[in-house]
Structures are given as C-alpha cells and as structure tokens.
C-alpha cells in the first residue's frame, strides 16, 4: 500500500474540491486533477462545500487583471477554516501558480502546495509530501513532463468531452502571458487523439471538442499544414460520434482546407469561435497578431459561403495601449460586417511580463469603459437580430445538464443546437435525459438564448443518454458519506468560472 493509500485508511475518507478559473484548457485540466485525486483515494465533496473539503485545489488563470485579487481573496476566506481544521490542505495550480511561484506562499503561508501547468500529475504526491514534512511544497516544471491526456480524468459530462490535441502556443501576442506559462506548442500524434475519441465514444460520449491553445496550428510539429483538417475528417468517420467542435483557432492558420473539412464532415458542427481581438490594423500590428482586418473578414465570408447557417463567435479586447477612437471604430465596423452570434468582450488589462504592459499610451479606464459599453450594446443588438432569424426553424437539440438557471421553475429543459446556441424548450411528457436528442421548433429569440415553447416534435434516446443515466444511477447509489450524486435534469449545477474566450487565442 502506498503512503497515500495509508493516509486515507488511517484518517478515513478525505474529500476534495477543485475550483476552476479561466479558459477551457483549465476546465479540462481540472477534470484531470479530479481524476488524479480520486485515483489516490479522495472523494469529491458535495456541491456547495464552499471550502469545507479536506483538500481545496485552485486551478488559476493569469490572463485577466483581477486574477490575482480573486485568488488571494479566496485564499484569505479559507485561512480561518484551515486554522480551525487540522489536516486540511490547500493547493494552488494553473497559470497564476506558474507565474507567481515565488510569491504565493509568502502572501498566503497557509497554502500547502503550489504546482504549475506542466506537472499537474504530481498533485497527489505533493499533497502527501506536504502532509508528512509539514511544510509547503512548491514544485514548478519548466516543460511538459508527460502529455496530460495520459492522466486519469473525471469528466464533468457523461455525454460530451474535451479532447486535447496540443498544448502550448508558438505565437507571441504582446498582451498575452500564456505562451510563457504553457510553453511552446506540442502536438499529440493523430493516432493517439483518434484512439482517445474512439474510447470516449465507446463509453457513450456523443460530442467531443478538440482543444488547443491554437487548435488549427496543429501539425506544426510534424510539418503537415493540413493535419488539422485531416483530423477533422477522420473524426467524421467514427461511428457513434454525433457532434465535433473545436476551440480556439487563430485567423493566421485558418486555411481553406479547414473550411472545406468543416463543410464536408457530417458531424462537424456549424459553429466557429475565432478571436478577432481588434478590427484595427495598427492595433493588430501592435498586438503582434499576424493578420489584418481584410484577412479576418475574408475568412468569415468564406465560412458563410460554405456553411450558411454557421454561428460565428469571437473575442475582442477594448482599450489596448495606443487604441484611438478611429481604431475602435474599425472594431465596430468588423462587428457590424461579421455579425457575430456572440462576442466575448474584455477590457484590456496590463499583465506583468508582457510587452504590452510596458507600452506607452495606456488608455484611461474611463475611456476604456465607455468604449466597452458601446461595443457591448452593438453586439447585443446584433446577437438579438441573428437569434431572431432562428425563429420558425426546426432544430435538433442535444439535451444539456445544468444549462438553464430557471428550468425548474419554468418546467423547461435546455439543450444545445448544432451551432451551439442555447435553447430552452418545453419539458415533454416523455422522459428525456442529458445526451438525448430532441427536435423542436423555435418560437422566440432573446439576445443570448432561444425558446421552443410548443410541444417537442421528436425525442431520440441515445447511447449518450444511456451513459448519463448509468453514471447518475451509480453516483446516487454511493454511500451517503460520499455525496457524489449528480443533479437531476432541469436543476442547474454550479458552473466553473470560465470564459469561452480568454483573450489569449
């Protein structure tokens, strides 16, 4: 029996809680952290534990300005709990831990473990070492020790899964610290990726999202410029895989073969999230983004020609150093031309260690706020107009879990359309489970969701729904002390603090 196993036997079942901040990469890493801890004998704390678990892990983000304040505020909240509970441990990982390795324990000496983005597999060992040695363990690897997809994973969903195809980023955007923290791009072999997808489908997963910091640069390791489009097409040949998505691509690497693969692969969903960041050529140059407005709008035009019903979303940064009113108007121009379904908008924030932080002509906060509000108002209007075009359409939805905050009160359920729009629909008499597919007619549009208020036209029970039911039944059958039961459909579970775009793609 390992020392970790012995500690669990001696002290009884120990619980854990993982708190996630940042992008989808962190969400997937948190699934691995949960898998590692459960593999080591820990069990998940009940929802709403709020720091009452025996081990609390923070998986942090370093992109936004308030990331530091958020972390240390949460750590301060846990300090009295830890002081009153011998044996409780706190671990900090992710991008902020990679960046602030030397200061976290100084500012919060009650933290037990600090680990980085390259060695998440060490967490159980570091926790045990901190317990035995009774001192903080700070261990940051400078490069990837093993591709994280080899680690055990506790997936949050029984019917949808992330699949990493690469880690790291070779771009040098002046506002972004991620490449310094996640390292250079490293690609997985196509055979390993497809084997993981096939294994997930065998478990009942029917939707996968191919994940990378710059997903369509995939293949740079092997010198194959069309590797990503080939991977998309290969996913189209996997029986039982109904939906394939990917995030996030970079406009520089968005080639015609990728557009063709999206259009011609039956299970590739009509959805594209492609960060814009700015519509101004001078600002894009200062950002070191390696494309210009004409190139970006040209990609949008080609995608819409090949996939007319595609929903296109983006990331935009407002108030980059040196941004003039004319520059900002160019961003508004692109937003009007592209007609994004949604835009994840961010106010520029200085990140120490990035070239942009040292640039002259930092924009006053009041100016940034005013521009931000104008951009949000414009995009809100466009999002609503684009959603109104969906009214009257008949759509197949994959029933989702925890997507609708008011589902229980309104007797509705929620699902995702092929283009990833959120749809709330009337709960049918027939039982439906997350992962099942329903056919509905859209009757109403709001800026951020659609409604299907009539009767459901069809219900298709799926292997994904079977997988959800099997896991839910197994979780509810666990002993009461473990408390791992999943919420029932229609009742939302707390979601990690995640932005669909983090401004770093």
Curated annotation (Swiss-Prot):
The keyword Iron-sulfur applies. Pfam families: Radical_SAM, UPF0004. [4Fe-4S] cluster 1 binds at residues 23, 61, 95. Residues 14-132 form the MTTase N-terminal domain. Binds 2 [4Fe-4S] clusters. One cluster is coordinated with 3 cysteines and an exchangeable S-adenosyl-L-methionine. Coiled coil: none annotated. GO terms for biological process: tRNA methylthiolation. GO terms for molecular function: 4 iron, 4 sulfur cluster binding; metal ion binding; N6-isopentenyladenosine methylthiotransferase activity. It comes from the Bacteria. Monomer. Belongs to the methylthiotransferase family. MiaB subfamily. This is tRNA-2-methylthio-N(6)-dimethylallyladenosine synthase. It comes from Streptomyces coelicolor (strain ATCC BAA-471 / A3(2) / M145). The gene is miaB.
